[in-house]
Amino acid sequence: MNNQSAFWKYYRDFNFFNLAFSALSAVFFGISSGLLIFISFGMGVGYLGYNFFRKDEYYLYYNLGFSKSYLIKKVWILNLLFMGPVLLILFLFL
Amino acid sequence: MSRLQVSRVNKSFGKRQILDEVSVSFETGEIIGLFGRNGSGKSTLLKCMLGTLKADSLEIRIDGEEIKPSEVIPRQKIGFLPQETFLPKEMKVRNVIPLIFPEGEDQDKIFYSTGVAAFDGKIVGKLSAGQLKYLELLLLAHMPHPFLLLDEPFSMLEPRYIELVKELLLSLKSSKGLLLTDHYYRDVLEVANRSYVLKKARAYEVESEHDLVTHKYLKINNE
């Protein structure tokens, strides 16, 4: 599981669906809500979107040694790490 | 030499038992053919072996060491070629290769393989069925798995690529063990050391087209 470039490809593809949904939510409910959705409910949207449009590509990652649960957990943790502090700052100072 | 033993595979979907105490064993240097009518459980067996489909029961041993199905993927012991392409369709072949093999030396092995130069500038989604399957097999061939499961590698390929794929499979025998399923039974019988047919959830060893007729996989003998 040393192939980080492959993982980042998954990260981008997965979050494409998540980001699209979260950005739309941000338009209607505000930036903070959009970010909160990105690290929570948006993960489910990313999962469903990836499963619908790119399901067969999971076999690429399986062959590279990444299980589906590992990929999803890592995406979620990274989203929390990247967006969690931004969300915290928004809640504290805005 | 490495040995893969898969035993006591049971799998049911609802009340229908698909696999009943199926066992397969092979080693690097061998090609095993697996036949069966549509819905007989060929792909199910392969997915259970890979760990992406939960079997009701299953034992996997590699060189005598028991491996949990959940460890098969992370330990890269078994590679899998699915029926549908696993490559991102929007990417160019020349970008897919470095994505999978970050090291330049590994990339060169793919780029300089027979026939790749003819399509390395194309987008994956624009490749012919033969080019795509050949590329996927080349990529799998250079991954570290000692065992490969190939789900219909000859399906929909033009004769030129069937021959190319067969050559590649035979060359892979030196380093890997292969289990392949396909309805192109003559091509499978030609490259396989041993073959099985799945019938009524059980696996039976077959050696010839005649045996396939006996097990009612083929209706008539076309010899």
Residue spans of the language-model regions?
Chain B
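Conserved structural motif at the start of ABC-family nucleotide-binding domains
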Residues: 4-6, 19-21
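The feature captures the beta-strand-to-loop junction immediately N-terminal to the Walker
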Residues: 35-37
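Helix-to-loop junction immediately C-terminal to a conserved catalytic motif
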Residues: 50
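ABC ATPase NBD coupling module
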Residues: 65-79
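Q-loop/switch helix immediately C-terminal to the Walker
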Residues: 84, 89-106
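Walker B catalytic motif
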Residues: 152-153
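Conserved beta-strand-loop-alpha-helix hinge in the C-terminal portion
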Residues: 202-223
